[in-house]
């Protein structure tokens, strides 16, 4: 029987250049990427804070809400750290619906119906969500929370703006936090 040998690279022992040039990492991001090298040079610092979502996305990734590419999302903080952050944005109404289902769907039913009820709840829950979980930049995720706060009681506390709705009320600039337009958020 033929044998197959799989070589798993030890990225931890490689220098940044070796990781950057490896076929498995060539189009991914990390402290070793060409983009990171460029950002460190541009912002004149070696300090970076990259999260896993940033590192696991393509160098060409673009935020679906503000349309900025990663090179325009990264920004330097007042403390001299380059923030490279992407966030998983989801509809919190789905969380609220899930809580209601957990509290009510299984009361007073025999154990024999529990599995069937659980399947039914799993099938219904996505109908309560206005949009699927989406990766967005840190500034769009923050703009969602800030706009909900600005609107106060005019929106349900578990309401979330979709990425396209966020894109409609923000003013995006390269390497800066977003500004918001309350009029466009209503």
Describe these PLM feature segments.
Residues 43-46, 57, 68, 142, ...:
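A positional "C-terminalness" feature that preferentially activates on distal terminal regions of long
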Residues 4-33, 66-67, 75-79, 99-103, ...:
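Long, compositionally biased low-complexity segments enriched in polar/charged residues
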């Amino acid at each position: 029987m033929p044998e197959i040998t799989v070589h798993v690279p030890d990225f931890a022992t490689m220098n940044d250049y070796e990781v950057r040039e490896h076929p498995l990492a060539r189009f991914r991001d990390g402290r070793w990427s060409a983009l990171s090298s460029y950002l460190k040079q541009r912002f004149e610092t070696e300090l970076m804070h990259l999260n896993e979502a940033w590192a696991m996305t393509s160098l060409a990734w673009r935020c679906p809400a503000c349309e900025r590419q990663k090179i325009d999302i990264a920004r330097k903080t007042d403390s001299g750290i380059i923030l490279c952050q992407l966030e998983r944005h989801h509809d919190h109404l789905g969380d609220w619906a899930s809580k209601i289902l957990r509290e009510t769907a299984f009361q007073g039913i025999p154990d024999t119906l529990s599995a069937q009820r659980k399947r039914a709840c799993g099938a219904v829950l996505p109908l309560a969500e206005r949009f699927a979980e989406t990766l967005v930049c840190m500034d769009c995720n923050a703009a969602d929370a800030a706009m909900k706060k600005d609107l106060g009681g005019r929106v349900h506390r578990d309401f979330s703006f979709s990425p396209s709705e966020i894109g409609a009320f923000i003013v995006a600039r390269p390497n800066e936090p977003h500004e918001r337009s309350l009029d466009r958020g209503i």
